[in-house]
């Protein structure tokens, strides 16, 4: 059996991006039985024709106890590397005879395999990004703040026909470039500063 909880992985498998926050959302795969089921808060209705059977849980429920009823009492179970400890620890209480393993490598490996269409999208996004970098470099010495430079990049992406950012860009000058996850601010660059442009498009 395998529990998948990462919203990006569930989106990959179901084609629907949902962010449950602190609430339970898991896909349970029972490979031996050939069954898959979604266990999710009732705040996220799946419509009349969900891909797989759905069990809804309420905030007042012991949602992991409900989940545990779908899981064997013995054997090996793969757990999503991103599953919150509060859920995992409760499941370990309810199913102490299971052997728990990191099961994320299964979905991670599957997601690495790209269709021809997906490969074409990635190649095109890379091409557009290369063009955007060429144009953005010419804007670096014009006195824009880091935030303004990011705004300029979005204009460039749209002008090139891109949908926009694949992630919010990091545009930083000088000392800010030493922070690998810097949040763009109102800093401006000066002659001799290092510049980092960590960007990507869709």
Can you say where each PLM-predicted feature lies in the sequence?
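A short local loop/turn or secondary-structure capping micro-motif enriched for an aromatic residue
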Residues: 45-48, 87, 188
């Amino acid at each position: 059996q395998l529990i998948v909880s990462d919203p990006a992985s569930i989106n990959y498998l179901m084609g629907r991006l949902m962010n449950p926050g602190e609430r339970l959302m898991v896909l349970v795969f029972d490979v031996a039985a050939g069954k898959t089921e979604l266990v999710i808060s009732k705040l996220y209705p799946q419509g009349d024709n969900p891909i797989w059977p759905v069990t809804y849980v309420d905030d007042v429920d012991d949602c992991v106890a409900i989940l545990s009823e779908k899981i064997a009492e013995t054997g090996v179970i793969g757990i999503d590397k991103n599953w919150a400890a509060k859920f995992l620890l409760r499941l370990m209480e309810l199913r102490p005879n299971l052997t728990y393993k990191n099961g994320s490598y299964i979905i991670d490996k599957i997601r690495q395999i790209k269709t021809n269409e997906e490969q074409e999208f990635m190649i095109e996004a890379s091409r557009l990004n290369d063009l955007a970098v060429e144009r953005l470099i010419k804007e670096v010495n014009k006195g824009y703040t880091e935030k303004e430079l990011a705004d300029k990049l979005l204009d460039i992406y749209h002008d090139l026909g891109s949908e926009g950012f694949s992630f919010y860009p990091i545009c930083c000058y000088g000392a800010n470039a030493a922070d690998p996850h810097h949040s763009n601010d109102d800093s401006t660059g000066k002659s001799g500063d290092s510049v980092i442009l960590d960007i990507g498009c869709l």
